[in-house]
Amino acid sequence: MSGRNMELHRNGTAPEAMKVIGINGSARKDGNTTIIVGKVFDELNKEGIETELIQLADYEIQPCRGCFACKGRGNCVFTNDGFAEIFNRMVMADGIILGSPVYSADVSAKMKAFLERGGVVVATNPGLLRHKVGAAVAAVRRGGGMTTVDTMNHFMLNKEMIVVGSTYWNMVYGKNIGDVLSDDEGMANMRNLGENMAWLIKRLKD
């Protein structure tokens, strides 16, 4: 571990471990969304922040049933899919990156179902995600990127999270896997987003 990452807090104690999870809503596990989330992760790792990528493609995510049985329980009562496990990891993390490709001018169906489930859980159990640092990123071929980013940002803002910005909208352009690497401006924006996210998480921990 570098000397920078071994710095003590002002009170002389060693800093707590910091962790960010990324949730990829793409059906393509190794596609462009994974690439751009990975670029943000690179900057977080440089600052000693642990990262973990969660692929929604690995899980069944059912839509919200609107039963409100989650009230007072801190999580969804239905545990026959992947939602409850992933949501627990969100609650334990310091930061959360939501990533999605653009499908029909919005987030993917799995990401939408995940956000709807999470939205009700937090609404009926206020404060579960309060003051966690969040960022939304989208892999886009042509149109719909702003709507996609807005959908994820609205979830985070409505749940009392602190949303990080960058030098431009958090979208990177590309159709085929790997095309996003040719979007120099978009990838630079992801690097800056990672730097800003690391800075904020460390300040909140200080």
Question: Each predicted region: which residue ranges?
Answer:
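Short, glycine/serine-rich, charged loops/turns that create anion-binding
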Residues: 27-28, 58, 141
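N-terminal beta-loop-helix "entrance" segment that forms/cooperates
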Residues: 56-75, 175-182
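Helix-loop-strand module that forms the ligand-binding subsite of alpha/beta enzymes
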Residues: 75-168
